[in-house]
């Protein structure tokens, strides 16, 4: 048996090497579980009024330096111990509209190109339909002869430091959290632990549904609660979040 460890909680970030050691010969690698990790970090800091997070889709791995560093550290630990670093999940689901699938493939490729350049060797997908665009950037980079530098293999170059992400805090972001959470709970009550959800349903434009699971429910609930607890002011409406905030 070979196991890949999902790094999806803040305590796990500080124990990555120890977990590989504990599994010994059964350890295959580490996986960067993006949304679960974001949810875990938010849950640990949500009591602090100085750590009120922006809208969740503004908190990307690429533009949030402390998150990037966590995953670069994951890669370094894997490369140091000859384990396989696995990138995040491409959550787009296939559509009957080919135009939507083409746009999803472009987005997936761009995301996986970034991961490949950080030293990740593989990634995973929510649906096999998108396996090829997710795998292509890793194959191309390796076939080019590119190899991770020695600096990329040293975990000490990537210390863990939790900071507040930058981005907009909007009422629209809160509405999207409420909408997504209600859809997820509906699916969960009907026996589905994961569900394809378009958080912008009813809005102009074409986009794929994304596979959402408990991580989405956790971070959506956490953000709604945090904004109400700290009476955060929305940038788009200049309104204060409170228990009377309603979905329009």
Mark where each language-model region is.
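Conserved alpha/beta-domain cores
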Residues: 1-248
